[in-house]
Amino acid sequence: MKFNPRVSSSRRKNRKAHFTAPSSVRRVLMSSPLSKDLRNKHNVRSMPIRKDDEVQVVRGTFKGREGKVMQVYRRKWVIHIERITREKVNGSTVNVGVNASNVMITKLRLDKDRKSLLERKANGRAAADKEKGTKFSAEDVMENVD
């Protein structure tokens, strides 16, 4: 159900917005889930993927392969990973693009901006968890029973 009247439900408009999205929006759309240990450590489920992150492919032809992200190719919506290549007919090797949603981040490249992003996301998640289940107090429930 749509709550905000300014948000379109039109398939045509959503596809246009997706495929003409600027690089700054594509960065967020090209996010990948974190591994279980990173998720527990940082209390964050996913992050925008970035060059020099270490990832593991979890779906597709290259499932199980691991490597470092060499390039995030936002124009093509793919990432290039070390050692995931294909040999062309003329003998040269080219990187094969992998969808960011098909990989899992196993090691983050952290700098001050990324650390602050992790903190912000973790704080927001902690606040949401704290509010969860406190919509009604026990007294409110018992009041309405009678």
From Swiss-Prot:
It holds the Pfam family KOW. Residues 1-20, 119-146 are annotated as: Disordered. Gene3D superfamilies: 2.30.30.30. InterPro entries: KOW, Rib_uL2_dom2, Ribosomal_uL24_CS, Ribosomal_uL24_euk/arc, Ribosomal_uL24_KOW, Translation_prot_SH3-like_sf. The keyword Cytoplasm does not apply. PANTHER family: 60S RIBOSOMAL PROTEIN L26 FAMILY MEMBER. This is Large ribosomal subunit protein uL24y.
